[in-house]
Amino acid sequence: MLKIVSKPSFNRIALMGREGVEGVPETLAALKDYLVSLNREVILEENAAHMIDGSRLLTVPANDLKKKADLLIVVGGDGSLLNAAHIAVPQQLPVLGINRGRLGFLTDIPPNELTQISDILDGHYREEVRFLLEGTVEEGDEIVAQGIALNDIVLLPGNAPKMIEFDIFINDEFVCNQRADGLIITTPTGSTAYALSGGGPILHPQLNAMALVPMFPHTLSSRPIVVDAESQIKITISPENDVSPYVSNDGQERVSIKPGGNVYTRKYHYPLHLIHPTDYNYYDTLRRKLDWEKRAAKV
């Protein structure tokens, strides 16, 4: 859901950035100084405090940001915002992105236009609610791993480059058996990421849907399928596999799953509250990021 909001304003701002990304320390420092000039209280997440001089500012562990801040500003690319979402969503802390990455589907504001933040802090912004996925890996009656994903839950080959055989169930109804290099279960947010390179459809962020995208399937008739986001997806790894595939959430963690194990994916109970400037337009973003502005050459 996308809505223009005139309030509340933001007064306690937490800053986060990923170390090792070019330009992030400089932008964090400039952002800190700008927020101080606006008489906002600035809180530094612990890693951000290592990158800039924040000797006079409060430093807070990532998992405690909500106790001190009412907005989290992330400096970096889409990967940095994905990482921040894993921290902010369970705390229900709104997130705004400053783009220092390559694409910037999720990080709207260029580093040379930090003055746009002033209007946002004063309560003039668009708030977009994006859902996440929750993935659970089970072997027998044991929960091996559990995690959330803003983009996707992905089944990947193991250490050997072999196809994986698995069964797909939706709401306990059998859908199909597949042999493929893997499977991407994507949100609308993730539909312009890994799933897009796998041939998946672009889903508008306001759709309450997710897509299942097979990776290099053995059967040419295997195609992506879009399902209701309220569905529960179960992937059963065939006992016939002689290698253990991996399950990944947003590419951040990777867990091995034995043949016979199950991967359950469903909608996570907390969404991401993503903050945009008032002139944000999703289709403008698609045109710019996917080079749709280029006209086809005349023959």
Swiss-Prot record:
Annotated NAD(+) binding sites: D78, G79, N151, D152, K162, R179, D181, T192, A193, Y194, A195, L196, S197, Q252
Example GO BP: NAD metabolic process
Keywords recorded for this protein, A-Z: ATP-binding, Cytoplasm, Kinase, NAD, NADP, Nucleotide-binding, Transferase
E.C. numbers: 2.7.1.23
UniProt keyword NADP, yes or no: yes
Key word Cell inner membrane present: no
One of the record's GO molecular function terms: NAD+ kinase activity
Location in the cell: Cytoplasm
Gene3D superfamilies: Probable inorganic polyphosphate/atp-NAD kinase, domain 1, Probable inorganic polyphosphate/atp-NAD kinase, domain 2
Principal subcellular localisation of the protein: cytoplasm
Annotated catalysed reactions: NAD(+) + ATP = ADP + NADP(+) + H(+)
Residues of the signal peptide: none
One term under GO cellular component: cytoplasm
Active site: D78
Family, as annotated: Belongs to the NAD kinase family.
Function: Involved in the regulation of the intracellular balance of NAD and NADP, and is a key enzyme in the biosynthesis of NADP. Catalyzes specifically the phosphorylation on 2'-hydroxyl of the adenosine moiety of NAD to yield NADP.
Protein's name in the database: NAD kinase
Organism name: Coxiella burnetii (strain RSA 493 / Nine Mile phase I)
Lineage of producing organism: Bacteria, Pseudomonadati, Pseudomonadota, Gammaproteobacteria, Legionellales
Gene for this chain: nadK
